[in-house]
């Protein structure tokens, strides 16, 4: 089976420059591919696939434009992958699965340097360092996290990314399949919310990390730094450049704060999932939340975004697959909160402000716990 590992790396200044140059080239080629196909469409010509564009770029465009030879100075597989990503974006657009592909902007779009293992010596890993094509050996900050080549593990591919001035590598490692024993414990239901992050049907509640004093302090600090950055942008009115060193330093401060807050939330999600999976339930049932619809509510959008419900679901799915736990997703319109777990009657007039569920049969329980118990016993679901 294939498993991904992501960790921070500590490249040299020369390696940092090469990574940034490769990422910049990939962004340029991706935008060029989008713009070229847009121009073809406006002229009524046929759409160019990623493979055809790659051949045209290398055999016609670059030879005819000597000032673009710098495209060939970076890792070719990374450039080819950026073209494939553009082709995938167009394919999704044609199938009505997403909007028209957007151009990637420097500093705002997440562009990565892709690498792949072509021969055994291309991608190797030791306890404290990793060998990446065109970069050579790069030191790893978290030693021993990635399985080593010496132990018989093989790296298939990976990406190098830059976030808030820090460099990360994510690799796909081939590891042997593990025999998973069937879990005989009782299944559980999980109700996600804004007041508390997750409520389990066994009575366990996981707090909302966004209400912690540490994150609130960081949010206040972020507001101050963003206000300072806004003042520095006043130079735009005077016609001066926004690429001054002080503006770039302030932008990096804001990025680092965003990154730190994001890491705290992700860490909380990982620890919550690890604790849930350790109980070894036979199945886990969650609800199919309409996050896109919830984000349209301007009063809830910030709170919903900071809870990272989709990330919780994807990480929970991965952990369930690793541990042989069946992940069930209840129907989106299943009335888990409005249904009485004791008698099964549905209370249609239940408001969002009603935190205690009271039924005519005399059943009284916390609203979220009642929903978690109903999810546990749900009969209409699909396997994630």
Which residue ranges define each predicted feature?
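Generic detection of short hydrophobic beta-strand segments and adjacent strand-loop junctions
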Residues: 5-9, 138-142, 206-209
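Positively charged, helix-rich recognition surfaces that bind polyanionic ligands
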Residues: 3, 17, 148-151, 163-384
């Amino acid at each position: 089976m294939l498993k991904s590992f992501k960790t921070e790396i500590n490249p040299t200044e020369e390696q940092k420059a090469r990574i940034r140059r490769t990422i910049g080239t990939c962004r340029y080629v991706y935008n060029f591919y989008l713009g070229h196909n847009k121009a073809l469409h406006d002229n009524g010509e046929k759409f160019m696939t990623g493979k055809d564009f790659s051949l045209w770029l290398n055999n016609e465009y670059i030879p005819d434009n000597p000032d673009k030879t710098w495209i060939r100075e970076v890792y070719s597989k990374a450039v080819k992958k950026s073209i494939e990503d553009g082709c995938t974006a167009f394919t999704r657009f044609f199938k009505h699965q997403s909007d028209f592909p957007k151009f990637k902007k420097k500093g705002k779009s997440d562009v990565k340097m892709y690498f792949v293992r072509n021969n055994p010596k291309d991608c190797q890993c030791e306890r404290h360092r990793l060998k990446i094509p065109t970069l050579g050996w790069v030191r790893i900050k978290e030693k021993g996290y990635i399985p080593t080549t010496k132990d018989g593990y093989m790296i298939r591919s990976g990406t190098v990314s830059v976030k808030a001035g820090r460099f990360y590598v994510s690799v796909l490692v081939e590891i042997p399949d593990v025999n998973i024993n069937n879990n005989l414990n009782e299944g559980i239901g999980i109700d996600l919310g804004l007041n508390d992050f997750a409520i389990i049907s066994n009575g366990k509640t996981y707090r909302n990390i966004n209400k912690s004093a540490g994150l609130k302090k960081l949010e206040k600090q972020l507001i101050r730094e963003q206000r300072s950055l806004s003042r520095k942008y006043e130079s735009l009115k005077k016609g001066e450049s926004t690429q001054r060193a002080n503006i770039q330093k302030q932008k990096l401060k804001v990025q680092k704060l965003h990154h730190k807050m994001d890491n705290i939330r992700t860490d909380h999600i990982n620890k919550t999932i690890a604790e849930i999976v350790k109980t070894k339930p036979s199945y886990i049932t969650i609800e199919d939340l309409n996050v896109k619809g919830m984000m349209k509510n301007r009063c809830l959008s910030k709170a919903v975004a900071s809870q990272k419900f989709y990330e919780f679901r994807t990480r929970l799915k991965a952990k369930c697959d690793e541990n042989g736990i069946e992940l069930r997703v209840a129907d989106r319109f299943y009335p888990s909160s409005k249904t009485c777990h004791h008698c099964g009657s549905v209370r249609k007039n239940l408001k969002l402000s009603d935190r205690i569920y009271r039924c005519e049969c005399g059943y009284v329980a916390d609203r979220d716990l009642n929903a978690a118990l109903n999810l546990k016993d749900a009969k209409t679901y699909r396997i994630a």
